[in-house]
Design a protein with these regions (language model features):
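Helix N-terminus capping/helix-initiation residues
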Residues: 81, 203, 238, 259, ...
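Metal-dependent nuclease catalytic regions and adjoining charged, substrate-binding loops involved
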Residues: 38-45, 64, 68-82, 169-177, ...
Length: 391
């Protein structure tokens, strides 16, 4: 392996790309193979590439006068949140279009979401050694989230509130046990001196950004907390949660040079006792490649929306493209009706309302793009100038 490269697409051919490498000291034209012999097939990326597209070539080899990367990242300055990519991996199928649906729908206030926020507060308190009683923890949480708690319909009934508190108290006990035993005895981490809480990462190399729940200071141990259920049928991690950890591991490996074999990544399902809820996640390269392809599709679609608008996409919105036939009962009973309701709002709107929405969405998409990658006519504009500036 010879390293990582930033390249610009010059020409697109059937089995290779002609690109220009912009790495300092390596400025030259070079061929980039779209397929190799070791399962690296990037032909699905070709429809999204145009002349002058920017690519990051990750973990790249030089073979027979051509570059062969392990991963390709489209427009890497356009950072996509790790959770955005992970949420496209559903039990009914993997589809990058879930990003569009999730972005356009209002964010619901549910007891599950509130429980997740409360569990995060509990983990923070346990790591700092507060050992708070549940009533004290609950009071602090409700004081800081009064509006969300008041407007949550599921907490309007006595039964709903009772179930919420029973679940929350159980999770507090599980988290306390995990910090006092698994974290210290099994992982050999001191809660105060050896860990970072909710560190934020910007990874230009992979075109990703994210915030981990817990990370050791030597970057070798990462723990992501989930207050919801694991896949109780298989007793394994939910697919979207697994993908989230795959991407966090990739950020630590490719961006911070931590070897996969030296890394420990865990999903902490605080709904269950630590003996059953703390799951170790290993790197699966097929998952990682698929996740980066989903990330590239999200970027390509966002860039298209910023120039051409969203109208054509919504006019040809295909619900069946969201599923590959898996979990047919879940699809027909829940996912499909939800998508029909989503697109129905747009299709039943007046022509003037749709026209206004389309124009406003295009404006927002353009502003989002400029905020990310900047304006060519204005030096050091956009968030990407933080790593692209020449000073």
């Amino acid at each position: 392996f010879v390293g990582d490269f930033r390249v610009v697409v010059l020409e697109k051919h059937e089995d290779y790309l002609l690109v220009f490498c912009v790495n300092e000291g390596l400025e030259q034209k070079v061929r980039l193979r779209s397929t190799t012999d070791d399962k690296n097939d990037f032909t699905a990326l070709l429809p999204f590439l145009e002349k002058d597209s920017n690519l990051n070539l990750v973990d790249t080899r030089w073979v027979d006068e051509a570059l062969e990367p392990t991963l390709i990242v489209l427009e890497p300055d356009y950072l996509i949140p790790v959770t955005t990519v992970a949420n496209c991996f559903q039990a009914t199928g993997v589809c990058s279009q879930y990003d569009v649906v999730n972005r356009l729908q209002p964010v619901p206030v549910t007891s599950a979401i509130l429980l997740g926020h409360l569990a995060g507060q509990m983990l923070d308190e346990e790591l700092h050694g507060y050992e708070s009683s549940y009533p004290d923890t609950a009071r602090r949480f409700f004081a800081q989230n009064a509006v969300q708690c008041y407007t949550c319909a599921e907490l309007a009934s006595n039964e709903g509130r009772r179930d919420f508190h029973i679940n929350a108290q159980s999770q507090q006990l599980h988290l306390r046990s995990m910090v006092q035993h698994q974290l210290r005895n099994d992982l050999h981490l001191n809660a105060l001196s050896d860990v970072l809480l909710e560190p934020t990462f910007f990874c230009e190399l992979l075109g990703l950004q994210g915030r981990m729940d817990l990370l050791s200071r030597d970057f070798t141990t990462v723990i992501e907390q989930k207050s919801g259920k694991m896949d109780e049928w298989t007793r394994r991690a939910q697919l979207s949660h697994n993908i989230q950890l795959q991407l966090y591991r990739a950020i630590l490996h490719f961006n911070h040079k931590v070897r996969f074999n030296d890394m420990r990544a865990y999903l902490l399902y605080s709904k269950y006792s630590p003996e059953h809820g703390l799951m170790r996640i290993e790197t699966i390269m097929d998952y990682l490649r698929e996740a980066l392809q989903i990330r590239n599709e999200i970027v390509a679609r966002e860039l298209l929306f910023s120039t051409e608008g969203i109208a054509d996409y919504l006019d040809h919105f295909d619900i069946d493209s969201f599923t590959d036939g898996r979990a047919s009962k879940l699809w027909s009973s829940y996912k499909r009706p939800a998508l029909e309701s989503f697109i129905g709002v747009y299709r039943q709107s007046s022509e003037s309302a749709r026209s206004y929405f389309n124009r406003f969405h295009r404006f927002l998409s353009l502003e989002r793009r400029l905020g990310m990658v900047g304006n060519q006519q204005r030096e050091c504009s956009g968030f990407a100038s933080a790593w692209n500036a020449t000073f």
